[in-house]
Amino acid sequence: MSITADAVKIFATGFELFKKFGIKAVTMEQISSACGISKKTLYKFVSNKPDFLFQSFSFFAQRMEGILYEVLEKNGGNAIDDLFAIERFAEKHMRGDEDRLIGQLEQYYPELAPRLKKKREELVFKITQDNLRKGMKEGLYRQDIAVDHITILYYGHILATHENNIAERPANLDELRQTSLRYHIRGIASDKGIQYLNQIINNEEWEN
């Protein structure tokens, strides 16, 4: 999605308003006022509030993808390093507010929720597949893994750690997610990758 600088400002402002006040409470008048434009000008970018919601959430996903890949490039780590960096990034930037807003969408705009969940799924699939191919190239992941299948399974892990209706939900979700991540890595790693993962774990235990 390629958008203009004006659209970036508008969608970013709107998304911050949704995070602060909630989806239902924010009106198009408030968005236009916060952006310093008229409501008529705002409607040059979108057709209605549901359209604005979809565009602003799509913008947020695109922005997070760009920032994440910049972080990974700056870190210069291998595929396993990247997985831990992705987990930290998601915890800091994407969980909490996004999950809460998706819940509000399901309640107030149920027709939008599946489309935006699909956007999130596509983003996770792309990041996961890129990571799998990088790890295979580096020799850290096994060469016989089925990228498409592993992507689906890993996405299932992510959803499982976000569900609110799990009967025996652990008190520490961070530990659950770390366990899930290590489980994922052990399932796809080569001997070289397992050795590297163990180094990370041992270093963490030593630091603690």
Q: Which role fits each region the language model picked out?
A:
Residues 55, 69-96, 154:
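Hydrophobic alpha-helical connector segments
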Residues 49, 56, 60, 64, ...:
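Hydrophobic/aromatic residues within well-ordered alpha-helical segments
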